[in-house]
Regions:
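Short, surface-exposed charged micro-motifs
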Residues: 3, 233-234
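Short, acidic/turn-prone active-site loops that include or flank metal/cofactor-
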Residues: 79-80, 101-105, 250
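Conserved alpha-helical substructure of the radical SAM core
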Residues: 1-88, 92-93
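Short, charged, surface-exposed secondary-structure boundary motifs
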Residues: 85, 107-111
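Glycine-centered loop/turn positions within well-structured domains
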Residues: 10, 106, 232, 241, ...
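Membrane-interface junctions of multi-pass transporters
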Residues: 223, 246-254
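Short linear motifs in exposed loops
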Residues: 85, 244-247
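Radical SAM enzyme [4Fe-4S]-AdoMet core and its adjacent flexible, acidic
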Residues: 29, 69, 98-102, 110, ...
Length: 254
């Protein structure tokens, strides 16, 4: 997981990324720093979350450099800048845009706290597919989710000719403004058993971009021991904290 910046053009209530101090939000990892981290890690798949990666002034260079290294890149985006940014990229089997969508129009716009985001994201998805790009969606399910509405949403996504759908429970962010919507383990199992029942029975052939073992984990049918090295993450957060600490020591009155 490569996080070249934490800035975003949305303020989603279930996300704590933009709550970082200003010094951290100003940071952009250089393409060279990104390449060095990816080469050191050695993982074949690189997910680029945010903030909003398309705000990075050199995101096209970062993505192309990773593709040149034969890395499978999942560029996460809320879709607001995607359509006008497509000209910066070239369709490739190594590049997938992963568009954040947490439900149909009313639900998604509520989650991102801005009207019109859903429609703009859908338009961007269609434009990207028309130009030959791979596109998946990334959905977070929170505690107040209605299982039937989530199923309707998955049916809607299935008609968009996507290259896959990703879904995840709402994991806790310490700094997120809304702390009430995150799911505990037992809530997660009960909710996903209901949501995924049509998929489990074979009634709905939803095209999830997941190992089925993960979906079984969500439903509580299996369990795993997590490891901190299971998904290595690299960002400018540690560097920014070091610089801020140094600045405060050198300029104590600021």
């Amino acid at each position: 997981m490569l996080e070249p910046l934490f800035r975003c053009n949305l303020a989603c209530s279930g996300c704590g990324k933009i709550q970082h101090p200003t010094e951290i939000l100003k940071q952009n990892l250089s393409p060279e720093a990104c390449f060095a981290a990816v080469e050191e890690c050695g993982a074949p798949v690189v997910s680029i979350p945010g903030g909003e990666p398309l705000l990075h002034p050199q995101i096209d260079q970062i993505v192309q450099g990773l593709i040149d290294r034969k890395k499978f890149v999942y560029l996460c985006t809320n879709g607001l800048l995607l359509e006008k940014s497509l000209s910066k990229f070239t369709p490739s089997p190594y590049l997938t845009f992963s568009v954040h969508l947490d439900g149909l129009k009313e639900q998604h716009d509520k989650c991102v706290d801005r009207d019109g985001v859903f429609e703009k994201a859908i338009a961007a998805i269609k434009a990207a597919k028309q130009k030959g790009f791979r596109v998946t969606t990334n959905t977070t399910v929170f505690a107040d989710a209605n299982p039937q509405e989530v199923q309707e949403f998955f049916n809607f996504l299935s008609d968009l000719n996507l290259d896959g759908m990703m879904v995840s429970p709402g994991y806790s962010y310490e700094w997120a403004p809304d702390q009430e919507g995150f799911l505990q383990r037992e809530q997660t199992k009960a909710l996903f058993r209901e949501i995924l029942a049509p998929w489990k029975s074979g009634k709905n052939k939803w095209n999830f971009n997941h190992n089925p073992l993960f979906l079984e984990f969500l439903m509580g049918e299996t369990d795993y021991e997590c490891t901190p090295w299971g998904s290595p993450s690299y960002s400018g957060f540690r560097l920014a904290k070091t610089l801020l600490s140094l600045k405060r020591r050198l300029l104590p009155n600021l």
